[in-house]
Structure formats: structure tokens, C-alpha cells
């Protein structure tokens, strides 16, 4: 099956923002390449990249409208003040398209939660693990991006048993699935991209939680409130959706917001402060997680 491939050359400082943007609009996989043309995955939490210029490459489903994709990318890059020109082409499937999966390893978040690529084994150090098995080819946002890592670590320590969760902008469904594996009663995954919802369904089935996962397009408002709301999307979108997101938690419900660069945190906090008692911002690399309890 052919793919639609996007190359975006950017400075190192902008690479993670572009990576998150591509995830948000439905990329199936994302890789980073340095000036030496050596592919790299997003580093594990706490690690640093060593190059100054990066090409961010993403694959989209073959049915993706290239003109609409270009327009969406150019608009979003302009909003992020990133001076970059996307190169979009059709790519025929080859074996090396998934070769980067060889470098994807089991990762732990918090005390219990592990994300493990299909076919790999847990390391000996894992004790009483909660394991999510994923095909990384279906799931960008498999914990390797700092924003996803922040959310997964927060979920690992959250009071989830018996709770209802909404994952707004669910992408591949990793946060909703993690919540269910950690004891949530039901999760609702919401996304504007039909391909993201398909990937979420496949990942949920892989992990045996499909019967407790509701998936819906973001054009349709959620049918009920929830105890925990998670949104790992761009800061500008969080601010625009602040009123809608604030209407979703039950009284005393919790919210976790990510996809936010450190210098955007105060603007996001200001948008949500009228609705939530916000806690101290959590940081990882240049990204933050904002959590709070509904007033």
C-alpha cells in the first residue's frame, strides 16, 4: 500500500513542536533525521538530541488528501511561528518503512505501567507490571514523546478504578487504553481524524479493552460527563477548547492537559484557571503537564 510522506526541515528547537503537530493531524508514524541522514526515534524521557538541524518525516494513509494536508500544515506552522516548507510526496511501501521499529524498546512510566511493542518481552526488572502492547506502526504517541510520557506517568499514579475517562484528541488511543488497563471503568476516545479512531480501535482490541472503549468524532459532543479528562493536543487548541473541556468533568473531576511548551504554560493556565483548581506544573524537557480539579 502506498503512503503519503511529509518531510519538514526545521531547527532542533522546533522539532518536537512539529512532531506533536503531525501526531495531532493523524500521522501514522514519525521519524527524525539529523544532518547526517541517520534516522532517530524520539529519545526516551530525559535524553537529549545532539544535532542542531532536524528533518521531521511523517507517513499518512494513502487516502489522505495532499492538498488539504499541505494547507493544514502551512496554517499550523504559521501559527507556531515556525518557518518551514513541507515537502509532500507519494511513497510506495517498502520493507524499510518499518525498520525504525527495531529501535523501539519497552518503556516504563511511573511504577507499574509498561508500553511494549508487539513481539518483545518485558525486562526482568518489571514487577507487578500493567502492560500495554502496541504495534508502533499504528501508534505514534507510544510514550516516546515527552507530552505522552508526562500523561502516562500521571495516569500511573491517578485514582482510576471505577472511574470514567475522556481522552480528547485521542490519536492512537494510548492514554484511553492505559487508563482502562490501570482500572478505569470506561473510556471515551475523541478525535477529528477517522484514521486515528481506527488505530485506537485496533490498539484497544490488541489490549483486550475494546468493550470498555467508546470512540467518536470530535464533531459529536460527548454524551455524558466523566471523572477524568485528558487532552494531549496543541496549546492553542487547548485554549480555544477551554470552555468545552471544562464542561466535561463531573464536580470534583480531574483534568490533565499536555501538548504544551513551557513558554505556553501561563496562557493555558489562565484559560483554565476559572474552571479548575490548578496544581503545580510538571515539566519534562521543554514540555509541561497541567493538572487540576474542577471547582
Task: Give the residues covered by each predicted segment.
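N-terminal auxiliary segments of SAM/dcSAM-dependent transferases
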Residues: 2-125
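Conserved hydrophobic residues forming the short capping helix/wall of the S-adenosyl-L-methionine
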Residues: 73-77, 204, 208, 272
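Short, conserved active-site loop motifs that form the nucleotide-linked donor/cofactor pocket
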Residues: 113, 212-213, 253
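Conserved SAM/SAH cofactor-binding pocket of Class I
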Residues: 138-222
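Conserved short alpha-helix immediately C-terminal to the canonical SAM/SAH-binding motif I
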Residues: 195-199, 237, 264
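Hydrophobic beta-strand segment of the Class I
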Residues: 228-231
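A short glycine-rich, Lys/Arg-flanked "PGG" loop and its adjoining helix->strand segment in the class I
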Residues: 239-254
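Active-site capping/gating segments
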Residues: 261-295
Amino acid at each position: 500500500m502506498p503512503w503519503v510522506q511529509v518531510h519538514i526541515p526545521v531547527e532542533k528547537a522546533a522539532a518536537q513542536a512539529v512532531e506533536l503537530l503531525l501526531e495531532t493531524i493523524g500521522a501514522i508514524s514519525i521519524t527524525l533525521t539529523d544532518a547526517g541522514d541517520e534516522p532517530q526515534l524520539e529519545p526516551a524521557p530525559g535524553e537529549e538530541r545532539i544535532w542542531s538541524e532536524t528533518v521531521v518525516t511523517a507517513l499518512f494513509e494513502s487516502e489522505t488528501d495532499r492538498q488539504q494536508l499541505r494547507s493544514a500544515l502551512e496554517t499550523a506552522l504559521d501559527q507556531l511561528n515556525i518557518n518551514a516548507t513541507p515537502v509532500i510526496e507519494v511513497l510506495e511501501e517498502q520493507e524499510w518503512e518499518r525498520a525504525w521499529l527495531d529501535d523501539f524498546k519497552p518503556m516504563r512510566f511511573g511504577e507499574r505501567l509498561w508500553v511494549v511493542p508487539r513481539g518483545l518481552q518485558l525486562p526482568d526488572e518489571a514487577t507487578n507490571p500493567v502492560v500495554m502492547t502496541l504495534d508502533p506502526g499504528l501508534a505514534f504517541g507510544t510514550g516516546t514523546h515527552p507530552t505522552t510520557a508526562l500523561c502516562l506517568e500521571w495516569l500511573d499514579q491517578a485514582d482510576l478504578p471505577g472511574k470514567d475517562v475522556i481522552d480528547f484528541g485521542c490519536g492512537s488511543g494510548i492514554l484511553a487504553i492505559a487508563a482502562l488497563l490501570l482500572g478505569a471503568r470506561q473510556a471515551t476516545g475523541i478525535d477529528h481524524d477517522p484514521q486515528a479512531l481506527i488505530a485506537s480501535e485496533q490498539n484497544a482490541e490488541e489490549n483486550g479493552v475494546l468493550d470498555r472503549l467508546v470512540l467518536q468524532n470530535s464533531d459529536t459532543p460527548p454524551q455524558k460527563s466523566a471523572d477524568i479528562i485528558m487532552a494531549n493536543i496543541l496549546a492553542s487548541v487547548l485554549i480555544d477548547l477551554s470552555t468545552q473541556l471544562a464542561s466535561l468533568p463531573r464536580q470534583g473531576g480531574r483534568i490533565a492537559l499536555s501538548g504544551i511548551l513551557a513558554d505556553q504554560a501561563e496562557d493555558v493556565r489562565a484559560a483554565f484557571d476559572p474552571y479548575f483548581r490548578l496544581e503545580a506544573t510538571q515539566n519534562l524537557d521543554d514540555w509541561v503537564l497541567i493538572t487540576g480539579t474542577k471547582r
